[in-house]
């Protein structure tokens, strides 16, 4: 009698995009050429007005690629939630339109989750691609976190969404906060880490494209606003009573100093930096005055 082999789980890949026609081809091809073949690609086009649609339609003959175009513009994390509702797989991964994966990304993460049923989330290291210098560097040179990692995420968030794979059942209970445009993955993964053990694969399995030109004052303002909202909402919650939020405050202050440096307002800079006694962090901020703006964006 022939033994029935268990069918490998279907991985639903969510690719959210908005005016991303320039980069989509590389991203989509990195999915098509995965060594793991049981996947579906859900492309959620957030009402793009460039050549995004025409680039996606070049792949229309591939039945595993499903294209959905929204009738109106949504916040990024609302769009992610809407895309999740389109999925059929038992496993979920995320890939943004300007990034891409190594060919064994899905295979290695599916294997881990199949062999370790007590885990519902796995992520990995990645490579940073500097498009201006055409240079690749490692994202984290330190060992990534494993297990119960809530405080580690609060102290140094190193869980890039494009490296993650999650069991879909997580999204029956949890979702992205649709009010965020920048920190929605941070918010979700911190909430999940309170309940879930999380495993990291140390090998880099993805490539993240750095766009320095995107670090606008408007985007910095939004980042500050969202972190302040998150801090205010969660700082006094019972579930976080044993956790330290001091690093969130440091990030907020650093973003404020960056914004002032970009504006060139020296007086405002010193008033912001020296609100508190001099420390090593304040001395670091003073370097911002010396460095070119394009370097500040990278820090």
Q: What kind of region is each of these model predictions?
A:
Residues 85, 124, 143-227:
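Conserved nucleotide-sugar donor-binding catalytic segment
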């Amino acid at each position: 009698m022939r033994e029935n082999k268990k069918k490998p789980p279907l991985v639903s890949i969510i690719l959210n995009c908005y005016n991303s026609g320039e980069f989509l081809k590389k991203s989509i091809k990195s999915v098509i050429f995965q060594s793991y073949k049981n996947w579906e690609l859900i492309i959620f086009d957030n009402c793009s007005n460039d050549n995004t649609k025409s680039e996606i339609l070049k792949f229309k003959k591939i039945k595993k690629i499903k294209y959905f175009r929204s009738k109106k513009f949504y916040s990024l994390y609302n769009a992610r939630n809407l895309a999740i509702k389109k999925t059929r797989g038992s496993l979920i991964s995320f890939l943004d339109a300007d990034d891409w994966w190594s060919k064994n990304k899905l295979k290695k993460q599916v294997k881990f989750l199949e062999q370790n049923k007590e885990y519902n989330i796995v992520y990995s290291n990645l490579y940073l691609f500097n498009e201006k210098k055409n240079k690749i560097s490692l994202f984290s040179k330190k060992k990534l976190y494993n297990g119960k990692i809530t405080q580690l995420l609060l102290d140094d968030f190193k869980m890039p969404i494009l490296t993650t794979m999650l069991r879909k059942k997580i999204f029956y209970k949890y979702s992205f906060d649709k009010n965020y445009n920048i920190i929605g993955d941070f918010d979700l993964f911190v909430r999940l880490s309170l309940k879930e053990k999380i495993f990291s694969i140390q090998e880099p399995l993805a490539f993240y494209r750095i766009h320095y030109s995107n670090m606008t004052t408007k985007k910095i303002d939004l980042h500050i606003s969202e972190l302040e909202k998150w801090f205010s909402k969660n700082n006094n919650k019972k579930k976080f009573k044993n956790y330290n939020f001091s690093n969130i405050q440091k990030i907020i202050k650093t973003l404020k100093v960056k914004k002032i440096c970009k504006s060139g307002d020296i007086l405002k800079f010193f008033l912001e930096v020296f609100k508190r006694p001099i420390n090593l962090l304040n001395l670091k901020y003073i370097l911002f005055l010396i460095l070119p703006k394009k370097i500040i964006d990278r820090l």
